[in-house]
From Swiss-Prot:
Function: Is a potent inhibitor of ADP-induced platelet aggregation. Acts by binding to alpha-IIb/beta-3 (ITGA2B/ITGB3) receptor on the platelet surface. Binds with the same high affinity to resting and activated platelets. Also binds the alpha-4/beta-1 (ITGA4/ITGB1) integrin. Is a potent inhibitor of human and murine melanoma metastases in mouse model systems, also due to the inhibition of binding between the alpha-4/beta-1 integrin and the vascular cell adhesion protein VCAM1.
Effect of residue 13 to A: Loss of inhibition of wound closure, but no change in platelet aggregation
Effect of residue 27 to A: Loss of inhibition of wound closure, and of platelet aggregation
Tissue-by-tissue expression: Expressed by the venom gland.
UniProt KW Secreted keyword: yes
Name of the protein described by the UniProt record: Disintegrin eristostatin
Single GO MF descriptor: toxin activity
Cystine pairs: 5-14, 10-35, 11-40, 23-42
Organism this protein belongs to: Eristicophis macmahoni
Domain Disintegrin: 1-49
Effect of residue 22 to A: Only inhibition of platelet aggregation
């Protein structure tokens, strides 16, 4: 069962977006960042330095 969330780039209608959903689009040499499915925050991609 999903935990509710109020706001954030990985929330939609008070639920977490699915894991793997892009939450921050790549810029320059950086890669996209993806939702984890467990948080409303958009975690930083570890490959982005």
């Amino acid at each position: 069962q999903e935990e509710p969330c109020a706001t954030g780039p990985c929330c939609r209608r008070c639920k977490f977006k699915r894991a793997g959903k892009v939450c921050r689009v790549a810029r320059g040499d950086w890669n996209d960042d993806y939702c984890t499915g467990k948080s409303c925050d958009c975690p930083k991609n570890p490959w982005n330095g």
